[in-house]
């Protein structure tokens, strides 16, 4: 039996993935599944560049606003939920379009990675928490880099949850996260066609800077304050890029201007890491983000109809 086709569009932040995916969905009777680890959170709209109702243009979107900011959500959870959405779209006779910049989420689908359910070793977790308290998250980041440099290329030095996961996997299995994932790959359920957007670095960085300014104008600081004040314990989601820096401003560790500049800098660094990630997949078909959307849609249609 022929597998259902699924179009995947990756690429760095601010490269125009959303606009392209919506126009593509309109052209091919598609529906969109988000692969963005921050857009899954409710209440976090501005800093995650979540598409609003007008922007969606009546195209159904899945995997947006599915959990509250303090909830835990793993890559395994994403894979299970996203596949359910993809099946639903296929059953309707429509074409699923997976779109986002979270490489871990995309890889979980296209490589059908089975994530081992490891029990949390509370004693070891406490040891890591104590070490972090004493020497900072940077120390754990460096430790994780020594153990699993390949996995750490894709993980931000602020991403406490994933840094701990790399260390805990190695502690419990004696294998790196990458080794474990390679052993856990299966034949994918769908026929995924992977596309990614790239563009001139200067233009991309300019777009990132502009986007951050627009987010601040739209009320990013107020959005972060609301979440910060609402939850007793600081949610992990506020460790995310664009939120963490505003928390530092709220706590008086940075001025407003410093926080904004830091978001721009970290976003540019993140874009660089995203591009590195997508380049690792040799089957990725690259689209030029400076081209008109219609041109990129034409390329996508040619490829999926081969």
Language model segments and positions:
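Phosphate/pyrophosphate-binding catalytic cores of soluble transferases and nucleic-acid-acting enzymes
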Residues: 1-306
